[in-house]
């Protein structure tokens, strides 16, 4: 390597662990940041992207992440030991440092930064839990509803303009994933 060349791109694989013989299943087009941790029965769909320092721990039930869904930096996703697994649909955005536990996030759901979604909760298609919101056990956010607070409560149904704004997040992260896949490399001063 000459002084002017950069190291080759990092092959993104994250830290992957089997648990009791069950390994993560990662679609070839999904992307996992090198510092993300996936344990056990984690299933990533096409184009799903898991960012830096996320932990997805599927030790007692599966975690399913749908196509093009983005799990942003520092998020923790887990399951419970009963009936509740974590089911994340297609085109879902989960903001930085969220906690998602044994719940269902339907297609195009949006979970804000630092928000928490607890066991048995459901966020229907296009539903939004704002940053630092707390969706309590068993609660349901309806289609295109905006919820906030701790505990979270419904504020209103989002307008078409608001929905369009949130819908920009998924293509942004798909594009960013492609840039990281091609351009992330190690560096030492």
Located regions from the model:
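Glycine-rich hexapeptide-repeat left-handed beta-helix
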Residues: 1-25, 59, 65-67, 73-88, ...
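Generic short beta-strand segments
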Residues: 35, 53, 73-74
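Short proline/glycine- and basic residue-enriched helix-capping loop/turn segments at helix->loop/beta transitions
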Residues: 93
């Amino acid at each position: 390597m000459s002084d002017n060349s950069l190291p080759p791109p990092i092959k993104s694989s994250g830290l992957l662990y089997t648990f009791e013989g069950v390994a993560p299943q990662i679609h070839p087009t999904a992307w996992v940041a090198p510092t993300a941790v996936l344990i056990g029965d984690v299933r990533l769909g096409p184009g799903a992207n898991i960012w830096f320092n996320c932990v997805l721990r599927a030790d007692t039930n599966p975690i399913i992440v749908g196509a093009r869904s983005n799990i942003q930096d520092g998020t923790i996703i887990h399951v419970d030991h009963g009936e509740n697994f974590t089911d994340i649909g297609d085109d879902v955005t989960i903001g930085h440092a969220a906690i998602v536990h044994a719940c269902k996030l339907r297609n195009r759901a949006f979970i804000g930064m630092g928000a928490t979604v607890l066991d048995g909760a459901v966020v229907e298609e296009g539903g939004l839990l704002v940053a630092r919101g707390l969706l309590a056990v068993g609660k349901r956010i309806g289609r295109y509803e905006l919820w906030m607070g701790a505990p979270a409560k419904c504020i209103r149904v989002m307008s078409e303009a608001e929905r369009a704004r949130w819908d920009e997040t998924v293509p942004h992260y798909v594009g960013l994933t492609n840039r990281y896949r091609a351009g992330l490399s190690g560096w030492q001063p």
